[in-house]
Amino acid sequence: MLHDLKTLWKIKRFRVLLTARTLSNIGNGMSPIAMAFGVLSLPGSNASSLSWVTASHMVPIVLFLLLGGVVADRMGRARVVGYADIVGSFVVATSGVLFLTGHATVPLLCVNAFIFGTLNALWWPAFAGLLPEVVPSENLQAANSLVGLGTNIGFTLGATMGAAIVSTVGPGWAIIGDGLTFLIAGILVLQLQLPTKMQTGEITKHPSMISQLRQGWSEFYSRKWIVVIVVCFAFINMCFEGFLGVLAPVQMKEALGGARDMGLMLFAFGAGNIGGVLVSLRLKPKHPLIVAMGGMPIVGFWMLGAAVPFHIGVLMILAFVSGIAMDLFFVMWMTMFQTHVPEESLSRVSAYDALGSTVFAPFGLFLAGPIAHWIGTSETLYIAGVIAIVMACAALFNKDVRRLEPIAELVKVD
């Protein structure tokens, strides 16, 4: 493990990428608390209002992910990530200014959320394929772990800062801080200056966009373990997005300590994410996806705990363990994904992965508020928790998921 860490730290491009991801996730930690309690503070707003804003961010991600995968493979992943972060920083900052000037409305925030979601649709497939361009393939698990560690330290710090800023000076400044982190991260990523395959002469002409999408689909669908996990996560993410984006803030406001308790719970979740990364640095399981999916049911139990609702201390414990489980999944999944899928198709296959995994997430966000208003927040959380537990367990019934092993001999990249 220490050898991997020393090797990675000597790679300048990896250090730059790690720094950028850590910084941007400080903003990502601020954003959920700031936007949720900012929207809920608007005159006449309720859980349904928050559903509209959060879903407006998720819908374009689902709509444009496949386009994002093709764009990333054509234009260069570092370039797409960098420019998406920079443009996104101004979009986010605009929302912050709307809150500060008293001009924030649900329709305006929905428009901004849609624009930012479109940029995220370009960002995700590009970032998913970026790491294998930066580090040797035999160090990918350690690299994913370290990026996850930086990501989660940033998120945990951001959640703490976000709760403090929202509680003292309001959501507007926290959202502007979020935008600033994206601006710095985007500038850093553009410094990587990774050449595209067209620039290196590996290819002289891009195939058509349609043929690239078909090739990506073929690579995606031919790996049944990817398809099974993606289908299960379509339902898990539907529940989790509705939980974290709408139901948890509403439950905190109605039954617990508001933004302060939401910040504490997100802090515990981020700390668990860090713990999961540290555990993943030590693990070399023969069947990584058994480990990855084996802990995911705890996320559903976290939702059930919020439904009761338990004391914030208990919810922090559930959030912490859920964080461990989710980051173990992330590291194992990304390592298997990056080593079993051809490098030249990574962004496109990742786009199909992200599209399938998030296809129901807008419904979770759109419906969470109205259903909670109709049958109650706790009752809605019970339903979400049960669905998440069932789907997390279902993946392990597939033999391809259970039997997948790491590739013994990995080819180095320059």
Regions found by a protein language model. Name each.
Residues 36, 92-99, 162, 166, ...:
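Structural signal for membrane-spanning alpha-helices in multi-pass inner-membrane proteins
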Residues 44, 76, 98-99, 103, ...:
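Helix-breaking motifs and short loop linkers at transmembrane-helix boundaries and internal kinks
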Residues 53, 62-63, 74, 80, ...:
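C-terminal transmembrane bundle of multi-pass solute transporters/carriers
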